[in-house]
Amino acid sequence: MKYDLIIIGSGSVGAAAGYYATRAGLKVLMTDAHMPPHQQGSHHGDTRLIRHAYGEGEKYVPLVLRAQALWDELSTHNEEPIFVRSGVVNLGPADSAFLANVARSAQQWQLNVERLDATALMTRWPEIRVPDNYIGLFEADSGFLRSELAITTWLRLAREAGCAQLFNSPVSHIHHDDNGVTIETSEGCYHASKALISAGTWVKALVPELPVQPVRKVFAWFKADGRYSTKNRFPAFTGEMPNGDQYYGFPAENDELKIGKHNGGQLIQAQEERKPFAAVASDGAEAFPFLRNVLPGIGGCLHGAACTYDNSPDEDFIIDTLPGHENTLVITGLSGHGFKFAPVLGEIAADFALGKTPSFDLTPFRLSRFSQ
């Protein structure tokens, strides 16, 4: 059987692409080296932030607004919502470049973002402590996503729509010819007119020339009481320290508050190098500078996990066809801020398989930018 689209890597982007392409009437084969959702990539750990006024640049705003609409639609397929509208407050020095981008995005796209000085911040959320020169940009319409529930939902919906799924079967080789794309797996060879490579952190095992650097990252859950929960209207957050370190976190659930450090981490080259949480001496204490200064009421570390970022050189996404192979789309280099975009990236992949022109300007995400 020849498929219209083979998906190599069915984590966040691949799971979304499988659903949207199958729903559009295509014959799709989803593959993954493991059984998604799993612990080997970048999507585990229960939750991920979604922000609309985007500190990483205005070019992402049209994508994330479309993603939000798709998240809202996906949530209708579950009793438990995938998107939780907790609001997100971005904390940092008043002269922060990240916050300037947030404000600029909000103004350009007329997003609902409220600026709070340090006094107003600490009045609204007494649990938060910040220096006098800090501000907060609060986006009430943002929040967080239940990442593993999202992937489970996409996989179920795709399967119910007739999508073929081949999991626990790594792809060892990809071959291109005039008839399309052939992949080799432990279960045999499969053929399609087009392919999506969304293999995340380990994409270089299949396409070594891609400029992607795997980085080991950790996040952890700390003891927190009901003051830090959504029931008390405590928001999700990002926080920039005076030295430039960037943190992110979520409202407490079941008396546990999850937090991670966005920058830093350990460069790795192979999956076996991603040691579990606490294997690196600094893991348990990584969030202490933020907690001690900004959330001093949070208790000790309860448990944690390790994941992997697939960083591009400029930490912007890579969304492009492989050079010389216009029938193969690669989406990678999401650099630790990609999950929120998964549905729109999956939709872009489905449109690629359908031969449709993208609805967005993807020029900033082309591979050619690295050779200029």
From Swiss-Prot:
Family annotation (InterPro entries): FAD-dep_OxRdtase, FAD/NAD-bd_sf, Me_Trp_Oxase_MTOX, MTOX
GO cellular component terms attached to this protein's record: cytosol
Enzyme class: oxidoreductase
Cofactor note: Binds 1 FAD per subunit.
Binding site for FAD: 4-34
Modified residues (S-8alpha-FAD cysteine): 307
GO molecular function: flavin adenine dinucleotide binding; N-methyl-L-amino-acid oxidase activity; sarcosine oxidase activity
Keywords: FAD, Flavoprotein, Oxidoreductase
Cofactor: FAD
Catalytic activity: N(alpha)-methyl-L-tryptophan + O2 + H2O = L-tryptophan + formaldehyde + H2O2
Source domain of life: Bacteria
Subunit structure: Monomer.
HAMAP family (UniProt xref): MTOX
Function comment: Catalyzes the oxidative demethylation of N-methyl-L-tryptophan.
Protein name: N-methyl-L-tryptophan oxidase
Originating organism: Salmonella newport (strain SL254)
